[in-house]
Each structure stands twice: as structure tokens, then as C-alpha cells.
Amino acid sequence: MSASAREHPTTAEPAPGGAPPEPRLVPLRAAVRALLRKELGLELRAPQAVPAMALFSVTTLVVFHFALQRGQVEGDLAAGVLWVTLLFAAMLGISRLFVADHEEGGLDGFLLAPTDRTALLVAKAVGLFAFLAAVEVVAVPAFALLLLGPAPGIGTYAQLVALLLLADAGIAVIGTLIGAIAVQTRARDLIVPLMALPLLIPVVIASAKGTTPLLAEASGSGLPLRWPLLLALYDLIFGLLAYALFDYLIED
């Protein structure tokens, strides 16, 4: 036996009487790292979700550019276009979040593993958050190029990034819960928007309301603090709900 095997055994010592040893519980942090590495590695080796979401976002913005028939948009119209586009792009990522695990048996294997089920929730939510952020790196510049007039200042972009990150956290948590439910049904592509959109309405409203003054031509007031606080509260509440409910959802 190698030194590393002696230092890091995977099972406990055999019990007296020849009973089979009980597997050691994998620490939550180690399980999250392994699952997240697998999640991001799969997307890097064979990109599927991020390119599809990014292409959908850019295509939708191009459609808005020609449909609105104006050189630029501002205020609530600009905010609405941005957040509706990002929301529906997120539906693509949510609907595919658990599909590979379900079809290839990875989900069943995880349920048999000696680790906390919360590890899968955290890894999937962080992975979806990363996918959303990657899409926005493409979608937001495309939005500015196609639909905004003069480029906003650095301060405006910084405040917009803060809103995007808070909204992405809420979408990631809700998306992980809904994805875990939908993957067990045949009509998952229908179930995801029907269940996720009502739950994400507060995210869209708060994000659009916070973005409106940032994209208003004559506004110099900046981002109202109440909207980021509302998003943070939403993230906290649904994060706790996800922590409490995920075990039951994934096992059923």
C-alpha cells in the first residue's frame, strides 16, 4: 500500500466480527470542488449551454434592434429589453442543468455516494452562476452596441455589474431547484419556464427597476440602494429554502 493510500483511506477499518466497513463521509467542501470541477470541465471540453445561451441573447438583441426601429433606447425600455433577454437565455441553461447527469446515470451515482446532498446544490448553483456570468460578458456589450447610444461611464457599468451578480445568484438558486424537479419529468422543456418564470418575477422587477436610472439619458442619480437590497434579501431567502428542500427534491 502506498503512503498516500495509508494517509487518506477511503473506508473505515473493518468492524469487529467481520462486518463490512462503513464508507467514510466525503467532506462537503471536497465534494463541492469535485462536482464543480466536473461541471465546468464538461462545459469547457464540449461547450453546449454557454454558446447556446450567448447565441440566443445576441439573436434576441438583434431582433429588438430592428423591431424597435430606433437608433437607441433608454430608461425603462432599455432595462426591460436587457433583462427579458437575459431571463429567457437563462431558461436554456436551467433546462439542461441536470440532463447529462440524469441520462448518463451520474445523478443516481451521486445519490449512492457517502456525502451531503447539499454538495450537488452548491456545485450546480455555482456552475449555473458561472454560465450566466459568461453569457453576460457577451450579451451586455452586444446590448450596448446595438441598442444604447453613447457608451455609459465606468461607474454605470460597475453598478450594472453589481445588479447582474445579485440577479445571477437568485436565478442560479431557483434554476437549480427547478432543474432538479424538471429533469425527472418528460416535459422538462415545458416545466422549466412554467415553474421558474413566476418565481423569478421579483428578480426581473428589482433588476429592471434598478437598471432604469442607470440607462436613463438625463439621470445622474445612480443606482437606488433599495433594489440591490431587495435582490440580496431574495437571494438569502431562496438560498435557505433551497438548502432545506433540495434533499427531498433530488431523492424523489
Feature annotation, model-predicted:
Residues R117-A144:
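Selective transmembrane-helix segments that form parts of the transport pathway or gating/packing helices
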Residues Q69-A78, P141-L165, T211-P228:
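Membrane-interfacial helix-loop-helix connectors in multipass membrane proteins
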Residues P47-L68, W83-L86, M195-A206, Y234-L241:
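Hydrophobic alpha-helical transmembrane segments of multi-pass membrane transport/permease proteins
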Residues S2-P9, E13-P16, D235-D252:
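Junction motif at the cytosolic side of a transmembrane helix
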Residues A78-I94, F98:
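Long, hydrophobic alpha-helical segments
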Residues S4-V50:
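Aromatic- and glycine-rich beta-strand/loop motifs that create alpha-glucan
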Residues M91-A113, A125:
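Transmembrane helix boundary and interhelical loop/hinge segments in multi-pass membrane proteins
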